[in-house]
Structures are given as structure tokens and as C-alpha cells.
């Protein structure tokens, strides 16, 4: 992707550089005012300023995501390489996931009772998979269950660790796609920032793949595969 012949990573780097300072300045002044360094505030003023501060925090997080995406596109990110249990990571992420509780949407983990060892950057893969879980819970409109199903595909070369995330009806098709060339991933969605584009690039940097459910509702589920650890 490029704009007017300028490489996409450079565009991202320039945007981050231009945005970071004003966001930091505005956030700093808002917090000075909230601490009443310029005088006392009414309840109404405090409420408005707190809302503005939350918005600045979100913009700051988006700027950080832009920086990370640009670095991934430029291959400037050094990934850690260590063996870890992917199944245990899935259980850990699910236990801390609270999105959807207020709408009676719950998360059910399956297939994580046995270790599934992979090699890679546990911190970055944790963020990527956590973002996929959060997106699945956030985008489900009705009460129900989102399933996270872990499995190992050992008859392929290379053998894969597979994680499918979605409604019950989508899981089989998501898992079946792991053994061949999987369909594309729908990463550009409003309201989720850049965590999904970042997640896809992190997974692919580990030699894996990420894809969406096929058909009329590609956002109904997603799945990923990572090479199983060889030692």
C-alpha cells in the first residue's frame, strides 16, 4: 500500500511523528486542569474534561498502534523466540476477557486440556489472539456463546497449531481451512483501532496465517494457525 508513491511504512512513521506531540500536549494540559491547577472545577466541567481526557487516551493508543503497524510493515520488529504452550495462553486470555458480559455473551474454550507447543513471541502473540477474542465478543449482537477451539494438525507439513474463534456453526469450516490455503482475513473494521492488522502481521511473521469465516458473514469468526514447535 502506498500514497503518491510514498511507501506505506514511511507514511505511518510520518503520521505518528506529527500526531504524537500534539496529543501528548493536549493530554498534559487536560490533566493539569483536572487537578485544578488553574482553579476549581464544577461537576459539569469535570465530567466534560474527563470525557475529553478519555478520548485523548484513545487517540494516544491509536498513535501507538500506528507506530507498531509501521514497524511491522518495515520488518523493524525483533520477535522473541521461545517455546510456550499455546493452549495455556488461550485459557489465560479467556479468563481475563470481560467483553460481552453485560450482553450475556460468554466465551467457551475447548481443546486446551493438553499442551500445544509453539515457538515465538508470547507477548505479541498474546496481544494478537486477545484482539481476535475481543473482536468476536464485541461484534456478536445477540446473547450466546463464542467458542475458542484449540487443536493440532499433525498430518500436514509443517504440522500446525490451530485456534478457531467463532459461533458453533462456523467452527468446522474455520478449522478445515487450516490444512490448505486459507481464505483472507477481514482486518479493516471500525471501532477496533489497528489491533487486527497488527495481529495478522504478527501471526504471519511467525510463519502462520489468519483468516475469516467464509460466506455472507465473514466477521462471524476467525482462525489462525502457527507452526508447532519442533523441539
Positions of predicted regions on the chain:
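A conserved beta-strand-to-alpha-helix junction within the catalytic ATP-binding
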Residues: 80-95, 126
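Short alpha-helical segment of the dimerization/phosphotransfer core of two-component systems
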Residues: 54-59
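Short alpha-helical Gxxx[C/S/T] motif in the catalytic ATP-binding
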Residues: 195, 199
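Conserved catalytic submotifs in the C-terminal HATPase_c
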Residues: 46, 80-83, 106-116, 123, ...
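Glycine-rich/acidic phosphate-handling loop/turn and adjacent ATP-lid/helix
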Residues: 159-193
Amino acid at each position: 500500500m502506498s500514497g503518491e508513491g510514498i511507501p506505506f511504512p514511511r507514511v505511518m512513521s510520518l503520521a505518528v511523528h506529527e500526531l504524537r506531540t500534539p496529543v501528548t500536549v493536549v493530554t498534559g494540559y487536560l490533566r493539569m486542569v483536572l487537578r485544578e491547577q488553574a482553579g476549581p472545577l464544577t461537576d459539569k466541567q469535570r465530567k466534560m474534561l474527563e470525557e475529553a481526557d478519555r478520548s485523548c487516551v484513545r487517540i494516544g493508543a491509536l498513535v501507538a498502534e500506528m507506530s507498531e503497524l509501521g514497524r511491522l510493515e518495515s520488518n523493524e520488529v525483533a520477535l522473541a523466540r521461545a517455546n510456550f504452550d499455546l493452549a495455556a495462553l488461550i485459557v489465560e486470555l479467556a479468563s481475563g476477557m470481560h467483553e460481552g458480559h453485560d450482553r450475556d455473551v460468554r466465551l467457551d474454550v475447548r481443546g486446551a486440556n493438553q499442551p500445544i507447543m509453539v515457538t515465538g513471541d508470547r507477548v505479541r502473540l498474546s496481544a494478537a489472539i486477545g484482539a481476535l477474542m475481543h473482536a468476536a465478543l464485541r461484534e456478536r449482537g445477540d446473547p450466546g456463546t463464542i467458542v475458542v477451539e484449540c487443536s493440532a494438525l499433525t498430518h500436514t507439513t509443517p504440522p500446525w497449531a490451530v485456534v478457531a474463534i467463532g459461533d458453533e456453526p462456523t467452527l468446522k469450516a474455520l478449522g478445515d481451512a487450516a490444512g490448505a490455503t486459507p481464505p483472507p482475513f477481514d482486518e479493516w473494521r471500525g471501532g477496533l483501532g489497528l489491533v487486527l492488522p497488527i495481529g495478522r502481521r504478527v501471526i504471519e511473521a511467525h510463519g502462520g496465517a489468519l483468516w475469516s469465516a467464509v460466506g455472507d458473514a465473514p466477521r462471524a469468526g476467525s482462525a489462525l494457525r502457527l507452526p508447532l514447535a519442533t523441539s
